[in-house]
Amino acid sequence: MGCDIHGYVEIVKYPRSSPDWWTSVIEIDSLVGRNYGMFGLLFNQRNNDNYKPTQEYPQGLPKYKFPEESTTFKESERWGEDAHSHSWISYKDLKENTDWNQEVTSNYICFYEPQNDGTLLYRGGFMMSSELTDEEHHRIRCGEEITKVIKFGEGEKEYVYKLGTSKVKDSISSDWQTLFDMMESLAKHVGEDNVRLVVWFDN
């Protein structure tokens, strides 16, 4: 079953003399899509890439001084029990405490087609495959590289299976980059501590 993200970008309401008065300015549902790389990196949800997350555990919703006036709070309540892992992160934390240069061995098994020049051509990746036995899955997850011939109708192909490598920079899709750019613009206007991303997930 897939997992999706919902939530809002919030800023401290003008005039910013009261740090407790936040207002919702961007509904992220309309902007970003499902991206397990970003879910895992920021909030440790569906972290199949094995990134070191900015937040290891959900923080819950922020404490709203006036929850009845908060679009974010009311929308999260509307989701009820279908929502889980509520959390939030300030733009400052996003910028300073996220390791954007990570390159790690992921939990994804990748398969490659050997080429005549000795290189491997990437063909795809998965968590589980009917083409591999349970024992082979286990061996690969323990770091072993397996070469196997797979039959396709009357033909066959040789593939190499091994754990893949994940790079944070490769996981940032254009929609998520747009979100980060918008948060950066807001932070320049109202301050890095006065911009935050509030989210929850559903399966």
Question: How would you label these PLM feature ranges?
Answer:
Residues 1-192, 202-203:
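Acidic (Asp/Glu-rich) sequence patches and key acidic residues
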Residues 194-198:
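Conserved GNAT acetyl-CoA-binding A-motif
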